[in-house]
Amino acid sequence: GALAVLRKDFKSVPIDFELAEIVDTDWQNAYKEFVKPWSDRQLHWIPLWEGDNIETPYDAAVVYLDAGMAFGTGAHETTRLCASRLQDYRDAHADQLDTTEVIDAGCGSGVLALSASALGFKKILGFDFDPEAITVCHSNSAENAHLVKPEFVVADLEKGFAGGHQGDLVLANIQSDVLIPHCDPLVRGVKA
C-alpha cells in the first residue's frame, strides 16, 4: 500500500511506526487563543470575544473583529503597516474623509475596510475572491454597529476594479505572488 510506495521513493522511512488517533480540533475557533488586541495611535482592534474585557480611550477608533475562516486577524505586520499608513493618510487628508474613496482589495476579514470606517472615512469598498471572506466581512460589519458600513462584494483583483472603479486610497494587503501579476488593475484602480 502507501507505506510500500513511500519506502520505494524514500529509503529512510522507518520500518517501525505508531498509529495514533488525531483528535479533531475546532479550527474555526482554535486560533482565538493566539489573537490579541492591538492598537496604534487612535486605532484599536479588539477580538470580538474580548470586547467586554478591554478598555479603550474615549476617542479611540475601535474595530471588533472575528476573522473566522477568513484571512485577517490583524496580527500580521503587513496588516498593521497598512493600518498605520491608513491613519497617516487620514491625518494628511482630514478635511476630505467624507469624499475620499477607500478600496480594500483582498479584504479578507474586513479589518482594514472597517478600520477605514472607524477612522472616519465614509466611502469604503472591500472585495475578496473568497465568498466565505465576504460572509465574515458582513458579520464583522454587523458587530461594529457604531461604524459606517463598508460595501463588501465578492470579486477578484480583475473584477474588483472592472468598469473603471477607482479609489483615492487602495489598500492591497495581499501576497506579492498575487499582487505582481495583477499590478495593472491595481494601478488603474488608484485615482490619478
Specify the residue positions occupied by each region the protein language model found:
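A short, charged helix-loop
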Residues: 57-67
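A short acidic, Gly/Pro-enriched loop at the edge of an enzyme's catalytic core
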Residues: 158-169
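A short glycine-rich, Lys/Arg-flanked "PGG" loop and its adjoining helix->strand segment in the class I
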Residues: 183-191
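N-terminal auxiliary segments of SAM/dcSAM-dependent transferases
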Residues: 1-56
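A short helix-to-beta-strand connector/capping loop
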Residues: 12-15, 59, 146-150
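Conserved SAM/SAH cofactor-binding pocket of Class I
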Residues: 69, 73-158
